[in-house]
Amino acid sequence: MKPQFITLDGIDGAGKSTNLAVIKAWFERRGLPVLFTREPGGTPVGEALREILLNPETKAGLRAETLMMFAARMQHIEDVILPALSDGIHVVSDRFTDATFAYQGGGRGMPSEDIEILEHWVQGGLRPDLTLLLDVPLEVSMARIGQTREKDRFEQEQADFFMRVRSVYLNRAAACPERYAVIDSNLGLDEVRNSIEKVLDRHFGC
């Protein structure tokens, strides 16, 4: 099997941070070479843009925000993702372009056609081989975000914003079931872990 590009995504409060540890443990048990990274971020340029994008004080228009996301992504692809895959290393990214369709598209209202243009220009033919989409009901997401001590620029948004974000995620998953695995992360930790491990086992033929 060629090196796999796997993404982990979902609305805020879906449990990505917790379940990244599950994925790391799965790769470690099998001794598979893997690189973990994140978006926006993963490179010095990406991390600098991340600080701007998540800072509640940042006043950026929708197009500027979207372009910053893709600027960080282009650097990420060129400096991190493609080199790792070329070296035979699997890559797991905490968020990727699905998040742009969901947050800037669904949440903010950026036309999906415009995002697709940037997607093709920045990524070429690069697409994830597998996307683990963590999903929780809106009220669970909002409750978990509410427990965050300091909310970032996106976490400060209202429920209707996250409702639109979640809808885009689920619609994209329904339209391409061969790439997406929707994980109910409102279940107990053990159940969520088992679900993720089963998806990875199946994907890698374990």
UniProtKB/Swiss-Prot annotation:
E.C. number(s) listed in UniProt: 2.7.4.9
InterPro entries recorded: P-loop_NTPase, Thymidylate_kin-like_dom, Thymidylate_kinase
Pfam families per the UniProt record, alphabetical: Thymidylate_kin
GO biological process, one term: dUDP biosynthetic process
A GO MF label: ATP binding
Gene Ontology CC annotation, any one: cytosol
Superkingdom, natural source: Bacteria
Catalysed reactions, as listed in the record: dTMP + ATP = dTDP + ADP
Cross-referenced SUPFAM superfamilies: P-loop containing nucleoside triphosphate hydrolases
Keywords: ATP-binding, Kinase, Nucleotide biosynthesis, Nucleotide-binding, Transferase
Binding annotation for ATP: 10-17
Main enzyme class: transferase
Gene3D superfamilies: P-loop containing nucleotide triphosphate hydrolases (3.40.50.300)
Similarity comment: family membership: Belongs to the thymidylate kinase family.
Protein role: Phosphorylation of dTMP to form dTDP in both de novo and salvage pathways of dTTP synthesis.
Name the record gives this protein: Thymidylate kinase
Organism (species): Neisseria meningitidis serogroup A / serotype 4A (strain DSM 15465 / Z2491)
Lineage: Bacteria, Pseudomonadati, Pseudomonadota, Betaproteobacteria, Neisseriales
